[in-house]
Every structure is written in structure tokens, then in C-alpha cells.
Swiss-Prot record:
This is RNA silencing suppressor. GO terms for biological process: regulation of DNA-templated transcription; symbiont-mediated suppression of host innate immune response. Belongs to the carlaviruses nucleic acid-binding protein family. It holds the Pfam family Carla_C4.
Length: 140
């Protein structure tokens, strides 16, 4: 042990043991933590810490591959004949507020349709809430 309380290897074998333990710890980390660590290490070499913190805060809630892209939303909405912005029937049957460009969701939307368009159909794959940053199952 050093004066500061942290162990420092002083032989090549010690360095090898330290490196192997770091590799094992990295393999045990979950996918989100690996992703955050990679982002931090890449950004710290190019930007100041406060900018890295802002970038990390904005990128941590979205994981690629869960079908939350705009293209996936449009594809699912078109599949069930709804507008991807306001969840109303599109093309409108009669006088509707939906023009598929500037429309907004109404006061009472069909939550099942909104969940399907936003997150997909499966209920067993967990997704990350942008507000909590935690995994939980999609509601019906």
C-alpha cells in the first residue's frame, strides 16, 4: 500500500494482475454502463469536463436498436393507419384536426395506440424511461 491508501503494483506481474482484474470488471458491467464509460473516455480527450457532462446527460437515455427512431414510429403508424404525431386516424375520414404536419395529440388519446406507435408491440423487452433512467416493462 502507498501512503495515500491505494495499492500500486511495483512489478510486471502486479501490473498484469491489475489489468486482468480491470478486464473482468469491464465484462461484468451492464451494457448501459459500458456505453457511458466509453462515451466519457472518448469525450474527455477532446472536450472540457463540463461539456462532456452535458453531452453525456443528453445521450444516456437513448439506446440504439429499440425502435424509437422517427422512421420506426412512422412505419408503425402507417401500418395501423394512424398519424404518428397526434395518433388520430390518418388520412382523415371527415373534418379532422390532423394534417400530419402541424397536429398535436388531443386531450384524450388512445394510450394503446400511442404506446404501440412510440415503443413497438412487444411487452417483454424492457425500455428506458427518459425521465427515470431505469428499465421497466412497457405498460399495456
Amino acid at each position: 500500500m502507498s501512503v495515500w491508501g491505494a495499492w500500486k503494483p511495483n512489478t510486471p506481474v502486479g501490473y498484469k494482475e491489475l489489468k486482468s482484474s480491470e478486464i473482468i470488471d469491464t465484462q461484468i458491467m451492464d451494457e448501459a454502463l459500458k456505453r457511458r464509460t466509453t462515451i466519457v473516455l472518448c469525450l474527455l480527450s477532446a472536450f472540457p469536463r463540463d461539456i462532456c457532462r452535458d453531452i453525456l446527460r443528453r445521450t444516456s437515455s437513448h439506446i440504439v436498436g429499440l425502435g424509437r427512431s422517427r422512421y420506426a414510429r412512422r412505419r408503425r403508424a402507417l401500418q395501423i393507419g394512424r398519424c404518428e404525431r397526434c395518433y388520430r386516424v390518418y388520412p382523415p375520414v371527415c373534418g379532422s384536426k390532423c394534417d400530419n404536419k402541424t397536429c398535436r395529440p388531443g386531450l384524450s388519446i388512445n394510450t394503446n395506440v400511442a404506446n404501440y406507435i412510440d415503443h413497438g408491440v412487444t411487452e417483454v423487452i424492457p425500455w428506458i424511461s427518459p425521465h427515470r433512467g431505469q428499465f421497466y416493462l412497457r405498460p399495456k
